[in-house]
Amino acid sequence: MKLPGSPGSRGAALLPLCLLVLKTWVPVQGYLYNNRYAGDKVIRLVPGSERETQALKSVFHQLKVDLWQPSSLSYISEGTVTDLRVPRNSSQVLLSYLQQANIQYTILVSDLQQAIEKQTGLRSSRNRRSMPGYNYEVYHSLKEIQNWMYQLNKTHSDLIHMFSIGKSYEGRQLFVLKLGKRSRRYKRAVWIDCGIHAREWIGPAFCQWFVKEAIQTYQSDPAMRRMLNQLYFYIMPVFNVDGYHFSWTDDRFWRKTRSKNSKFRCHGVDANRNWKVKWCDEGASFHPCDDTYCGPFPESEPEVKAVAHFLRKRRKQIKAYLSFHAYAQMLLYPYSYKYATIPNFSCVESAAYKAVNALQSAYGIRYRYGPASSTLYVSSGSSMDWAYKNGIPYAFAFELRDTGHFGFLLPEALIKPTCTETMLAVKNITMHLLKKCH
């Protein structure tokens, strides 16, 4: 297994974890992303009629806006809360149109560049430098996360084993942490992945937080000790490694993978529409330039194929699949591709109900929960549905904070409360697994 760091550089590989905070991405000349988002706006509107819906879809398509919520024009209907990023050269045209058409809207972000600078600017760099160790309350680059994994693999070998399940389209390792006490050869397991969609940075932040809490509270928390003694956790902090890296270097709001298309100049596939379950049906697009592009065929993306292969081999062992996204404050379970009740609905629904109540107990944050198709929207080819269809009885997708005030730019100040409350939900689901549900 090739580990991160310079080939042959033993000294670099043995740097203590506390020095990794110095190896961080710092804005050049004070501007992130070459100031490309200066003047861009994020607006929210709700179509009030079918006429407004069709008119908005048409103008959105013409102006090439970036939909934040929902993820596709096909999901917009009367009453749908719609958040979108409007480039500065289109914002005046769109706002004038909305005013003339008497369509109500709210400006959530008046200057996106300023919002980005505020979220991940020089304050973050200072925080990273000043912390005595790894700071779990800031966002980290892919290199930092992989180095963090490597260090934990060395310093906590009694609980953690790091390995690669393959390579991404651009050749990056797909690292996974196996977390748990090696008390016996076979134990049931839970799979957790974060960062399927590149721009949803709070996902990877939670995966890191989960590992931190596990290793720090194993001795002091009876529930955590029971979880790690009786289960293994396979944790993939960054699923879409190429896209996540690209969201740090080039486009903060990139969603897809980074694979190339032979017929179009557009890059990437929606890694949550690329699974072999009702592939490229409702809620997915055949067009390579769309954010919900399903790919040329199921598992076309090496990242998806690698995870699917890993889960298939362990389908008898893995009893829960948890995937972390943003944003909406929801806990979703199958089905996503159809309106139907899953066979073990009562057990799954009970686990979801208890999880969202546990989450709310921390800070009063309310999450909606239910089948993805009716709670969020219908989408085909999702990892959650695939996991359930392949014999994993508890399959959930979290949509973490918030509900749109910050959207994908959730401030670093909210990482701790978001992860703290989510931790309660995940522990609740895990403890539910350890009991028999009838």
Label every model-predicted segment.
Residues 2-438:
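M14 metallocarboxypeptidase catalytic domain recognition
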